[in-house]
A protein has these predicted regions:
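A detector of single, family-specific signature residues
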Residues: 1-395
Length: 395
């Protein structure tokens, strides 16, 4: 008798479940469970029923889908069942291999079971690692900060026109003046000494430097023609966007402290530090996205995980022309490697990676194609470093 399994097609808030004792022996019809404790108890009942019939504990097999599987995976682990995750690409291959292609949630349970019984799949290991979650949260915050800065600059150009000709609008001086006075016309009514006092209390300026800035600000205020009056809601919007930027900066600082404590123990982080061209932010992102490198047995598996493996089509007399990369892997890690290559080229570093790039470039390839090929070579180098525990060495 084949191993019993519970096949699960996961979606947002609910999943389709079906039991199997062998591929040709489904137990009952697929049914829907919501991701609530009251519904998830049905999985426990199904597991007991399958164990009674097959005299073996069933395995729980599900389709890996972003974040929606996490709650159901934790519940099933609490039942003491082994979990196996399959890629949506694998179940899609099974579905497309059928003569009559049918895509329904209930039918997907059978496709998932087919993958389990006909292919070798790995046991699921929860990817709940703090480094990755913190790194991705930091990335989201940085993206939000870029958006918020755009909003801030737009309001600043309206309320404080031409201020960027006097000061760097992202500097501390600009922040102190805008948050304190809110509108340039307010400065007209303030003395130079009052402006100096504000600068000395809120920033690290010498007295002479503070007076220079104060005279410059007074000169700006006397020439400024604001697009709105002092009571306009745009002034409030400007201050609000400035406060949001400061709040996001503080959040990033807190995350950086947490990441610093966690990454000190990470061998991946320590080895990647030796690769030239990897800055602080890229270093954190790459360490987080690689995670447990021991799950990759070969460099080819690591390259495929990043999505840098070439797609190949072979048919008849066509000997298998190599097309573009698959892009079916970890997009964040792929982007990081591409940025590292560009950084190496910008800094004019001389190593085996940049020489490989120029070799490809001299053969007629465009910058992008040569850079992507270099990313693949760098990925192989990184895998070798991690597997052997060696630092990057320029050859």
């Amino acid at each position: 008798m084949e191993n019993p399994i519970i096949a699960c097609d996961v979606s947002k808030g609910k999943s389709h479940i079906q039991g199997f004792i062998g591929l040709s022996n489904p137990v009952g019809n697929p049914f829907v469970v919501r991701h609530l404790k009251s519904d998830l108890k049905l999985i426990k009942e199904l597991a007991k029923s399958l164990e009674k019939q097959a005299h073996k504990k069933p395995k729980f097999v599900f389709e890996f889908t972003g974040i929606y599987h996490e709650c159901i995976a934790r519940y099933v682990q609490s039942l003491g069942l082994d979990l196996y995750a399959i890629s949506p690409l694998e179940s899609a291959k099974v579905r497309k291999s059928q003569i009559r292609v049918t895509k329904t949630d209930s039918k997907d349970c059978l496709n998932i079971a087919t993958v389990y019984y006909t292919r070798c799949i790995r046991k699921f290991e929860s990817d709940n690692n703090d480094i990755k979650s913190l790194s991705r949260r930091k990335r989201d915050i940085r993206e939000e900060m870029v958006r918020q800065r755009g909003v801030y600059h737009r309001y600043l150009d309206l309320v404080w026109p031409c201020f960027d000709e006097y000061f760097d609008v992202d500097s501390k001086v600009c922040g102190i003046i805008v948050s304190t006075y809110k509108h340039p016309y307010v400065i007209k009514r303030r003395s130079v000494n009052m402006v100096v006092e504000i600068l000395l209390n809120n920033g690290r300026f010498s007295k002479n430097r503070a007076f220079d800035i104060a005279y410059k600000i007074k000169d700006y205020a006397s020439n400024c023609v604001s697009g709105v009056d002092e009571k306009s809601d745009y002034v409030n919007a400007l201050i609000s966007s400035y406060s949001k930027i400061n709040s996001l900066k503080k959040e990033i600082e807190e995350i950086n402290l947490e990441l610093d404590n966690l990454l000190r123990k990470s061998p991946v982080y320590q080895l990647l530090k030796t690769v030239p061209g990897i800055g602080a932010n890229l270093l954190i992102q790459m360490s987080a996205e690689i995670g447990d490198y021991t799950r990759f047995k070969t460099a080819k598996q690591f390259v495929a995980y990043i999505g840098l493996d070439p797609s190949i089509l072979q048919s008849g007399t066509n000997d298998g022309e190599h097309y573009s990369i698959t892009r079916k892997g970890n997009g964040i890690l792929r982007s990081c490697l591409y940025l590292v290559i560009n950084q190496m080229l910008t800094r004019k570093l001389d190593n085996q990676i940049t020489r490989f790039y120029f070799k490809k470039k001299s053969s007629g390839l465009s910058h992008k194609v040569a850079a992507v090929a270099s990313c693949r070579k760098l990925a192989c180098c990184v895998f070798g470093m991690l597997k052997n525990g060696t630092s990057f060495e320029t050859i």
